């Protein structure tokens, strides 16, 4: 579940050690729910275009596409596409345990060991106006394990979701030709600036802010362009869990609906994209069998294009959880991005991301009750062919504690006694299909 505090994040390495015995591959999360997973464009921006509606495009801010010379006719036939994502990461502290490689990141967590992060295939048929369509996303690897893990429920035999290899499975009905429609099933969450598939992001690793929003949801979503404002799309979600664990998001045992909404505005001139989401719920936020917890999560992000080769992005996440019995947690997280396309094949991307994670009662993870993690990340990418992307990335992480009860990052003796972590990674993503 993507409700990571750093105690949970550090538990991830331990959990994956066990999970690695069950699967031989490595994983991912926010694949764009579009009819294809295109490779990164020559110009700046992630691999997906701005969403007209959640049923047809990724619900995350992206670089607006350049005007096309001629639009291709709609394709309503069966289609498929996918990707393979692998990496090698070295932690300069050189921990002995390969699963203790990068305690603050989500997917690139293996140290000094080549790893398959994600193998994914999408099968879909776009919905013609007044007709039905569908999409299924199948995946394996560490990404599938992490997206569907419930570490707090592991002692109850609930360490993984049974259908972890089915990341998305939903039907679509197109209400009109202008992009209105309804989806029913399991789909990626609208929250977050970054997505599961690394080639859809500016950097290979995910930001600190990414740690505080969900991975996926299950239920219904209804979306439509706002009358009189065709650049603005509104979406309403009725789900069985704003956050997801083995039970939440697929069979939420709180027996209550969660409510989410999204507003997505794309500047008609292509200068910026602005997206805001809000989620309200009362669910078993702290794992299977935990207390009922009031949940509020809000995500706001902006992408601004300076020109055809340069862009900046901003992301702000607010999350508050109030479990029955006390122990309120309030999170304010942020990320700042800059991407520069150098030429047709090369680009650089910089990111600074952090959070203030405050506990009032309950578990105290820092001397003053507030965890303040941050990361500084620099990425150089090489797009050698249309369907292969290589990245070299340096990342520095910091947390404001490293005491025995609440450990920090792992050192060379595999003891989590450090406040800082430095890693470098080499990754490759191969895409295929239509």
Language-model regions, residue ranges each:
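Outer-membrane beta-barrel translocator domains and adjoining extracellular loop/strand segments
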Residues: 92-100, 146-153, 162, 194-201, ...
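Outer-membrane beta-barrel "beta-signal"
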Residues: 382-384, 388-392, 416-434
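Hydrophobic, lipid-facing positions within transmembrane beta-strands of outer-membrane proteins
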Residues: 114-121, 164-171, 216-220, 257-261, ...
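Outer membrane beta-barrel
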Residues: 67, 72-243, 253-257, 264-273, ...
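Detector for outer-membrane/organellar transmembrane beta-barrel domains
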Residues: 231, 254-256, 261-374, 432
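N-terminal periplasmic/intermembrane-space "pro-region" immediately following the signal or transit peptide
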Residues: 2-99, 104, 427, 434
């Amino acid at each position: 579940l993507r409700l990571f505090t750093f105690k949970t994040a550090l538990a991830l390495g331990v959990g994956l050690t066990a999970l690695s015995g069950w699967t031989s591959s490595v994983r991912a999360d926010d694949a764009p729910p579009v009819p294809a997973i295109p490779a990164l464009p020559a110009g700046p921006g992630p691999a997906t275009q701005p969403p007209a509606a959640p049923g047809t495009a990724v619900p995350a801010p992206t670089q607006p596409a350049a005007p096309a010379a001629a639009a291709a006719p709609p394709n309503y036939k069966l289609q498929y596409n996918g990707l393979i994502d692998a990496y090698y990461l070295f932690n300069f502290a050189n921990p002995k345990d390969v699963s203790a490689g990068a305690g603050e990141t989500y997917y690139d967590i293996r140290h000094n060991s080549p790893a398959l992060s994600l193998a994914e295939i999408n099968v879909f048929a776009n919905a013609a106006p007044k007709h039905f369509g569908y999409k299924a996303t199948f995946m394996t690897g560490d990404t599938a394990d992490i997206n569907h893990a419930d570490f707090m429920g592991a002692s109850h035999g609930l360490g993984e979701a049974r259908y972890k290899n089915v990341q998305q499975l939903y039907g679509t009905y197109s209400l009109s030709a202008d992009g209105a429609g309804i989806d029913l099933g399991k789909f990626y969450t609208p929250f977050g600036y970054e997505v599961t598939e690394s080639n859809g992001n500016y950097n290979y690793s995910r930001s600190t802010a990414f740690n505080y929003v969900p991975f996926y949801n299950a239920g219904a979503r209804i979306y439509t362009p706002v009358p009189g404002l065709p650049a603005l799309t509104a979406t309403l979600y009725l789900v069985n869990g704003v956050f997801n664990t083995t039970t939440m998001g697929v069979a939420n045992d709180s027996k209550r609906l969660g409510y989410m909404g999204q507003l997505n505005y794309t500047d008609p001139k292509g200068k910026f994209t602005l997206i805001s989401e809000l989620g309200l719920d009362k669910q078993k936020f702290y794992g299977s069998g935990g207390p009922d917890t009031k949940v509020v999560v809000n995500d706001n992000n902006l992408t601004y294009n300076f020109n055809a080769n340069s862009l900046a992005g901003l992301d702000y996440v607010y999350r508050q959880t109030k479990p029955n019995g006390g122990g309120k947690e309030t999170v304010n997280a942020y990320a700042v991005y800059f991407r520069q396309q150098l030429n047709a094949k090369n680009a650089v991307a910089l990111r600074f991301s952090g959070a203030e994670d405050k506990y009032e009662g309950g578990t105290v993870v820092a001397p003053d009750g507030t965890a303040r993690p941050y990361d500084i990340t620099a990425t150089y990418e090489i797009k050698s062919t249309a369907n292969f992307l290589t990245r070299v990335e340096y990342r520095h992480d910091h947390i404001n504690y490293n005491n025995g009860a609440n450990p920090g990052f792992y050192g060379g003796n595999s003891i989590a006694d450090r406040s800082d972590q430095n890693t470098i990674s080499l990754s490759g993503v191969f895409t295929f299909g239509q």
